[in-house]
């Protein structure tokens, strides 16, 4: 066939066909999501033990950047011992995620009872997610987007497989890849992963680590910026950061009071309603208010 005789590809969606249903909101109204995610080096079992008692909502054992090459095998063995411990696997135990270095880590740890999830560094394509999901069936996955290419593929990665439970940025590598010096230069990428996560019916992304463990004021300011962009919670690299992160992401007393007023009003009058101060409230506003109360532990 000549070029103009070549048939056009089929339209992706018949305009007359009904639109597919919107995905369900992955944030239950009555469940408080984790806010603090503490990274610890996998070759330091004593540090991991302290992290499990630090009050962090999730502990992430790092087998990648935090472990020197000649310590990788030891770190994997120590992590396997931890994840095989019945105490780690108990229903009320702190969830333990593992940021893997490679496929050897995945194969060695995937079936251990104390593993809550894998965090997959430097993911750039959905095919990588499919591969890990195939060799570690049933394990929740959290791809980390750390390059310009990953940001371009954010939605395809987020929606790659039902094993994906969330996505997040790896900002140190991303900053280097993009040549960004000022923190605000990453806001586009942050917003991109927030939109990709929500479009894929995933929870809001967790903010990347704040590297200066002494600058708690700077951490607070950075968390406020992340919250404004739609992120929820933050990874930490030191226990002293946990309290600041939690306070930054928990609703204020005023926000809780406002949410209680909205939820109470919605219980009396179904559907769209107007508050005494004249503001219009619909189902989306009520759902947001319920999430606020869940965060505050008031649901």
Regions found by a protein language model. Give the residues of each.
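Expand to "…catalyze enediolate/carbanion chemistry for C-C bond making/breaking, isomerization
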Residues: 2-299
């Amino acid at each position: 066939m000549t070029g103009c005789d070549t048939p056009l590809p089929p339209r992706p969606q018949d305009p007359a066909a009904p639109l597919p249903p919107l995905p369900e909101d992955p944030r239950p109204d009555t469940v408080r999501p984790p806010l603090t995610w503490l990274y610890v080096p996998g070759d330091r079992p004593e540090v991991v033990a302290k992290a499990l008692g630090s009050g962090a909502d999730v502990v992430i054992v790092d087998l990648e950047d935090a472990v020197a090459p000649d310590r990788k095998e030891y770190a994997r063995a120590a992590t396997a011992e931890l994840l095989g411990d019945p105490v780690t696997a108990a229903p009320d135990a702190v969830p333990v995620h593992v940021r893997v270095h490679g496929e050897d880590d995945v194969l060695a740890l995937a079936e251990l009872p104390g593993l809550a999830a894998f965090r997959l560094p430097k993911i750039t394509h959905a095919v990588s997610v499919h591969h890990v999901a195939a060799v570690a069936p049933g394990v929740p996955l959290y791809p980390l987007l750390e390059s310009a290419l990953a940001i371009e593929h954010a939605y395809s990665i987020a929606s790659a497989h039902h094993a994906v439970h969330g996505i997040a940025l790896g900002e140190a590598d991303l900053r280097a890849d993009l040549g960004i010096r000022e923190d605000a230069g990453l806001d586009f990428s942050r917003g991109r992963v927030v939109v990709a996560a929500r479009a894929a019916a995933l929870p809001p992304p967790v903010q990347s680590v704040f590297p200066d463990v002494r600058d708690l004021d700077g951490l607070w300011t950075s968390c406020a910026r992340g919250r404004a962009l739609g992120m929820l919670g933050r990874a930490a690299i030191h226990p002293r950061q946990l309290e600041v992160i939690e306070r930054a992401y928990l609703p204020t007393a005023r926000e809780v009071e406002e949410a209680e007023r909205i939820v109470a009003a919605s219980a009396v009058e179904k559907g769209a309603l107007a508050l005494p101060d004249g503001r219009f409230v619909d189902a989306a506003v009520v759902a947001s208010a319920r999430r606020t109360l869940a965060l505050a532990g008031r649901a």
